[in-house]
A protein has these predicted regions:
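SH3/SH3-like (including bacterial SH3b) beta-barrel domains
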Residues: 25-50
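Acidic/polar N-terminal loop/beta-strand segments that form early-domain functional surfaces
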Residues: 26, 60, 133
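Short, flexible active-site loop motifs that bind/organize anionic cofactors or intermediates
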Residues: 32, 61, 175
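SH3/SH3-like beta-barrel fold
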Residues: 42, 55-59
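Short, compositionally biased
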Residues: 58-69
Length: 340
């Protein structure tokens, strides 16, 4: 049910840490279908109603809704930004908002993602969440619920089938040459960020350093609310240098009928297939048919197109030239998915 609004009439401003916040046509954060626009820090709005968690405002002649956490009656200061790469400035931290759908399931949530804005001449007006897998200190000492409805996992993986809880963030594997997976996923994320920024995409770096205190649920919920899609970067734990693939949504009726999977699984699989095609076009070796069915915490809580892409395994080369090749393939996949 829609919240009850107390009628008001005043001027308010959007207050963010420099990033943008979504305004919606309804008070529902479980879908991105109702997003009208992403509005930036200090945007002036006319407020017509207030409720406990939402404000009703006028934006470009439309009545829209914005989370009250991002509204202030005083003109906010512009945040200090630092040049993040030759193509963007760090535009602000995005933290987990407790009012966002599924946020309460997160256990490790004090960290922040970092939003980078493209300064390319042709902007795509899309935010890509790039999630460098693993890299949360203490992530294995905490467990989170596998599914929002409390049901058990339908496939194996880091956590076996039948489990209802899983480690909040696993440590990941170690490459055959002794390098930690979390180190390589971060290096890959930085390469991908720069290539996406150059191509006109804004990038939400879920993990922008060695450690981020955000578990897999927090990472997914932040991406749900601050990005147009969510790409988690991983390498598999096998040792055969088998190639890249994406984790597809298992073809299990009970799982596909559980929300939010039910409303979004086709988007997840379509994004994964596009990324694999992009990698293939860049000359990257692809494993089998390019996908492997897996019940993941990420997929179980995602309300935007979301995928875990495995870019190889323990035996794979992870030199800078290989990361560049992988980055080119992933960008091609993103462009294809969005038809850009």
């Amino acid at each position: 049910p829609a919240p009850e609004f107390k009628a008001v009439s005043d001027t308010v401003y959007v207050k963010t840490n420099g990033g943008s916040v979504r305004v919606r046509s309804s008070c529902d954060t479980s879908t991105s279908d109702n997003v009208v626009a992403n509005v930036g820090n200090a945007t002036e709005l006319t407020r017509t109603g207030t409720s406990e968690k939402w404000d009703r405002v006028e934006y470009e002649g439309k009545t829209v809704y914005i989370s009250s956490d991002f509204v202030t009656t005083e003109v906010p200061k512009e945040p200090e930004t630092s040049a993040a790469s030759s193509n963007a400035a760090a535009d602000g931290h995005v933290t987990l908002n407790h009012s966002w759908k599924y946020a309460d399931f997160a256990k490790i949530k004090s960290g922040a993602a970092v939003l980078y804005r493209s300064t390319a001449s042709e902007k795509k007006n899309k935010v890509i969440a790039v999630n460098a897998g693993h890299g949360t200190k203490g992530g294995t000492s905490v467990k989170t619920q596998c599914h929002p409805d409390g049901t058990a996992k339908v496939t194996g993986g880091t956590t076996g089938a039948g489990a209802t809880s899983a480690v909040a963030v696993s440590t990941g594997m170690t490459f055959s040459d002794g390098t930690a997976e979390s180190k390589v996923t971060l290096a890959m994320a930085k390469v991908l960020k720069d290539k996406l920024l150059s191509a006109g995409y804004d990038v939400l770096m879920i993990r922008d350093g060695e450690d981020v205190q955000l578990d897999n649920i927090a990472r997914s919920v932040i991406a749900n609310n601050a990005a147009d899609c969510h790409i988690a970067l991983h390498w598999d734990s096998t040792t055969s240098n088998k190639g890249a693939f994406y984790m597809s949504v298992p073809d299990v009726a009970s799982y596909k009928n559980m929300e939010p999977v039910k409303s979004h699984w086709q988007q997840h699989n379509a994004l994964g297939a596009s990324l694999v095609e992009g990698l293939k076009s860049a000359g990257v070796k692809i494993f089998s048919g390019g996908s492997m069915a897996m019940d993941l915490t990420q997929t179980s809580y995602s309300t935007v197109p979301s995928v875990d892409i495995e870019l190889g395994d323990k035996a794979s080369d992870h030199s800078q030239s290989t990361l560049n090749q992988l980055g080119d393939g992933l960008v091609a996949g993103v462009k294809a998915y969005f038809g850009q």
